[in-house]
């Protein structure tokens, strides 16, 4: 990946973080967990080689790549990315995010253009991703399935069941990406998950890659791995990345941005 491409992708991440800050200032939401996964989404949707092609996703083409956001509370990051790619107008997020019965809710919903699966009940997206990958394999359909999972979400038993299922069925067309931002909804993850997940995943037989979750080039290289095994990418991230007063503080899991924090974001993100 050449430097001009890296700079272009970094500008996309900046715009997405600005969008997250603005909508969280207006309407609240899951700000810190959205900020932590922006580079992951940018690598998935915008880096080369191109994956998750919009025209195939809109048409539900059988050969499309599929993305499932199992950590459905990262909705603001995904909405901001889909706006970047013109799936729906920016005004939807400006005017309707978390407002009544409008489709841009506090967890991703399949009625939103570009969203494959409704999520929010943690751990469920992993199983859906396994089913879709298995179907592609059985039907000999091309295309990858990508599933973004929170590190706190890994306390759900269904995540581990999905991992074992993917390994047993040799789902080499499936990649789990763990947003390892180290903070769950209430506390630091290390306070309730006491073992090293990567060792367990490797012990089960998965191909595990650990990357800097804020380095788009590293994430993209991991996504391009040609392993013949089911792959798990563990992305080392910072919850609240990009806004210093939000970073690494459990209180910001879901919270309306106040004036002082908004001004900090304006200064640090440059808007």
Language-model regions, residue ranges each:
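Generic beta-sheet signal
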Residues: 65-67, 143-147, 174, 228-237
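N-terminal capping segment at the start of a domain
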Residues: 12-28, 179-181
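Conserved thiamine diphosphate
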Residues: 141, 190-222, 265
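Cofactor-binding active-site loop characterized by glycine-rich and histidine/acidic residues
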Residues: 22, 33-168, 193
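A short, conserved beta-to-alpha structural element at the edge of catalytic cores
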Residues: 168-195, 204
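A short alpha/beta connector and helix-capping loop motif
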Residues: 156-181, 230-235
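Glycine-rich beta-alpha junction loops
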Residues: 73-74, 78, 181-182, 215, ...
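Glycine/aspartate-rich loop-and-adjacent alpha/beta segment that forms the canonical ThDP
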Residues: 216-271
């Amino acid at each position: 990946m050449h430097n001009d491409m890296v700079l272009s992708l970094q500008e996309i991440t900046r715009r997405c973080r600005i969008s997250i800050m603005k909508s969280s200032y207006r309407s609240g939401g899951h700000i810190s967990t959205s900020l932590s996964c922006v580079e992951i989404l940018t690598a998935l949707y915008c880096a080369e080689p191109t994956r998750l092609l919009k025209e195939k996703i809109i048409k539900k083409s059988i050969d499309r790549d599929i993305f499932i956001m199992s950590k459905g509370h990262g909705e603001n990051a995904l909405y901001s990315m889909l706006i970047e790619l013109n799936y729906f107008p920016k005004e939807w997020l400006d005017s309707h995010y978390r407002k009544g019965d409008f489709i841009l809710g506090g967890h991703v919903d399949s009625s939103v253009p570009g969203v494959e699966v409704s999520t929010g009940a943690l751990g469920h997206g992993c199983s859906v991703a396994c089913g879709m990958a298995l179907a592609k394999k059985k039907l000999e359909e091309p295309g990858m399935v990508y599933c973004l999972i929170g590190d706190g979400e890994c306390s759900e038993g269904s995540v581990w069941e999905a991992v074992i299922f993917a390994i047993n069925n040799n789902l080499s067309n499936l990649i789990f990406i763990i947003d390892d931002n180290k903070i769950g909804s209430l506390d630091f993850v290390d306070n309730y998950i006491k073992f090293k997940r990567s060792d367990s995943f490797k012990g089960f037989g998965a191909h595990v890659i650990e990357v800097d979750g804020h380095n788009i080039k590293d994430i993209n290289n991991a996504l391009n791995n040609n392993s013949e095994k089911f792959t798990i990418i563990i992305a080392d991230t910072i919850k609240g990345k990009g806004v210093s007063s939000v970073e690494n503080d459990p209180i910001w899991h879901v919270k309306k941005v106040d004036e002082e924090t908004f001004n900090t974001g304006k200064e640090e993100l440059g808007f």
